Amino acid sequence: MKILFCIVLILVLLVLFAVWPNKRRDALRAPFVGHNCAHRGYFGKDQRPPENSLPAFAAAAQNGYGIELDVQFTSDRRLVVFHDDTLDRMTPAKGFVHNMDWADFSAQPLAGSNEHPPLFADMLRTVAETNPDTPLIVEIKSRAEYSKTYLEELCRATIAELKAYPGPYCIESFDPRVVGIVRRQAPDILRGQLADSYQSYRKDGTHAVPAFAFSHLFGNFLGRPDFIAWCPAKRNWAVKLNAALGAMMVMWTALPEHDTAKLEAENDAVIFQWYAPKQKYRE
């Protein structure tokens, strides 16, 4: 019985070590608390203006919202703002963003409009000129096959360009490796772990074990995130534990059909899409 108790205790301690968040850093999180942040900029279901376009970011800043956006590399290592791994949903082209160079990528029209995918630097400049106090949540996109060296270069480029932005910003990723790299390269930047429900990971084809690990934040030991960005699904025990331990809770993505008042009450910041909430719901 004593041996069994010791085994259980060790397992519990290992799990706690795996999922534990960073200590609270209230000064860094203050600009985000109570803020509604426009998912990929402020755009409508008709993609007018298109998501992750300069007009969508300018509209969000003009309306006083925070902004969530996505960054990744082109094949020639230009840092661009684009959500999907592939081009076919938002442009006439096909293939992966990381396999196309900037010249070809920048020529692609977004959602049949006259807008084109922007460089991250141009996005930052546009927002700074519109409202320099706009809080930014920057998601660094990743794929399982990306090497440590590639991710380090991607994070380094993102951090370097953010230094020119005058307003508050933080970095998040679904990939715990990215959060860990940000922790090492720029420990003073607020960092967050994105996570989805176990059911969503399984639906997307993720095997059961990694789906459980990702949804239950077992990668937190790499990045010790300041915040958890969680989906509308019910919080599992690991997410609840992080909230109890003081991690800032960010909700993605609130839609018009959700109980948005409830989501605002339960979260420190909300990433929204396709409706017009108040700029801030909590002071």
Question: What are the language-model segments listed below?
Answer:
Residues 1-283:
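Phosphate-group recognition and catalysis centered on beta-loop-alpha active-site segments
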